[in-house]
Amino acid sequence: MYNLTDINTIKRIMSRHGVTFSKALGQNFIIDPDVIDPEVCPEIVRQSGVTENDGVVEIGPGVGVLTQEIAKKAKKVVALELDTRLIPVLADTLEDFNNVEVINADVMK
């Protein structure tokens, strides 16, 4: 499992897949060190009240920073990502989670 709380790890993964951020898609990835701190994302999920019996739909998982934490708690996670370039990135970063399904979709349509 990748440590997605490390900005350099995220940059390496993005670079390996040839992905850059797209302002046209309004992409805002969680890369602020204060937010992706190893203790903050688990706390966000804890505060959400997600349990092992819950299914979660995540819209715009980005590179999967929060998705990993949700997958550790939820029974099933369906992550809907608009940007086709991020699908292989998510397959890479979420490969250790068999309870995550990534779907390339535009939820606004």
Model-found features: residue ranges?
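Catalytic cores of RNA-modifying enzymes
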Residues: 1-109
